[in-house]
């Protein structure tokens, strides 16, 4: 949308992409493209082409998969110190992910890690690299299934911290183990 001079009216609307599934929040890149997230769980349809972060050039509408960021139910990502931090909105418990690109402007290759968190000490360790085609299953195999003790409860937004030395994100779940 392009806003009018009054900030209240819309002077132009451009549709720049179609064909993506269950879109959620995204992020701007330092080089002028933007990222949109498919909040589509891999487990729902392993054969589907959905469940990716897509990088879109607003000038041309060109879109490409950021395959290095993994296939999962993406919520949002934030850039800090050259690495992308990714929230997963699959359900009650999930890990926080970190993508370290091989080339800062190419989100198709790099290493993907999951954070195994310890709530009792408020510390964690990055586990990986993970298989970007199935990061949730790979992380569960390497760190154990996500629980209230070692992961986070229903990620929502994520942004770079004010100091620029990390990220801030929110959880919207109850934090209690189901069942």
Residue ranges and their predicted role:
Residues 1-179:
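Sequence/structural signature of beta-propeller domains
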